[in-house]
Amino acid sequence: MDKIDIYSDGACKGNPGRGGWGALLVMGEREKEIFGGELDTTNNRMELKAVIEALNLLTRPCEVVVHTDSQYVQKGISEWIHGWKARGWKTAAKAPVKNVDLWQALDAAQARHKIEWRWVRGHNGHAGNERADALANRGVEVAA
């Protein structure tokens, strides 16, 4: 099984506002950069979109380490999602889960992979995270 590191980030100018997502995929010596943007979005949606887009590029099951500076993504996918699904995509307070479309897409995208979700402190000199941040900001610039 191939081993991949994914560094993902989202950015938003205004929240909601113009946003971008970016991801760096690293497999051994090979790297791939991806990014994109949306005009009317939130930082959390862009954080989720970055991981979804990166995972959807993988053509076969892989061992993946996802590095994200978003506790929303890291805790959501590794802790909260189980309860949400059990409650029919409702929170513990019985409210609809925010960004449910993207959470469902992420749940589907991660299903065939073995994934370790790692939180990294943002803007702290972590090379992969800094590159993902730069890609997310490029996504903001191209948002249309």
From Swiss-Prot:
Location of the RNase H type-1 domain: 1-141
A Pfam family it matches: RNase_H
GO MF annotation: an example: RNA-DNA hybrid ribonuclease activity
GO BP term (any one): DNA replication, removal of RNA primer
Keywords, alphabetical: Cytoplasm, Endonuclease, Hydrolase, Magnesium, Metal-binding, Nuclease
E.C. number(s) listed in UniProt: 3.1.26.4
Subcellular location: Cytoplasm
Residues that, per the record, bind Mg(2+) 2: 9, 133
Intrachain S-S bonds: none
Textual note on the cofactor: Binds 1 Mg(2+) ion per subunit. May bind a second metal ion at a regulatory site, or after substrate binding.
Complex and partners: Monomer.
Protein name: Ribonuclease H
Gene name in the database record: rnhA
